[in-house]
Amino acid sequence: MIVKATEEEIQEIRTKSADALFEGTMKQFHPSAERVNELVGSALEKGCYYLVSRQENKLAGWVLAGPSADFFSKEEIGFIYELYVLPEYRGQGLAKPLMQKAIDELSIKGYPEIRLSVHAGNFAQHVYRELGFIDKQISMSLQVVKRP
């Protein structure tokens, strides 16, 4: 069953979000608890919400979804900020239903488009593509060597 997170579940998610972000960014970003609280707090304040999957009354995974705006046009769009399934529940087919519930809710709210960002090499890309997401833009990076 996928439902909106309770306050208690949101607090539990906050304790696990640093690890989720570390994994989701392909181990490039490991935020402090303070930074996690800033990120989550900011998202929740602007109208985002968590949907959770429970297995035997335990938190198994979550998706964070809500409003965003296109950088160029400022058009309001739906956005999926985070998808995470706890390691002990992986391989049980939880990611796709979490995503579908978020897509359904954002669609009902009338957003003309739903976007997400994903790091290159992230295993979840195949789930996103199976749900119909396509590459829209590519973010590129160049490591610069600091000179003395």
Regions found by a protein language model. Name each.
Residues E82-V85, G91-D104, E130:
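Conserved acetyl-CoA-binding loop-helix of GNAT-fold acetyltransferases
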Residues G41-V52, F79:
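A short helix-loop-beta-strand connector motif used in the catalytic cores of GNAT acetyltransferases and
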Residues S68-I80, R90, K136:
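A conserved beta-turn-beta hairpin within the catalytic core of GNAT-like acetyltransferases
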Residues M1-T15:
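A short beta-loop-alpha structural element at the N-terminal edge
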Residues A18-L39:
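Conserved GNAT-fold acetyl-CoA-binding loop/helix
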Residues K96, A120-I138, L142:
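Conserved active-site alpha-helix within GNAT-family acetyltransferase domains
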Residues V52, K58-P67, F79, Y84:
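Conserved beta-strand in the GNAT
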Residues L106-S117:
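Conserved GNAT acetyl-CoA-binding A-motif
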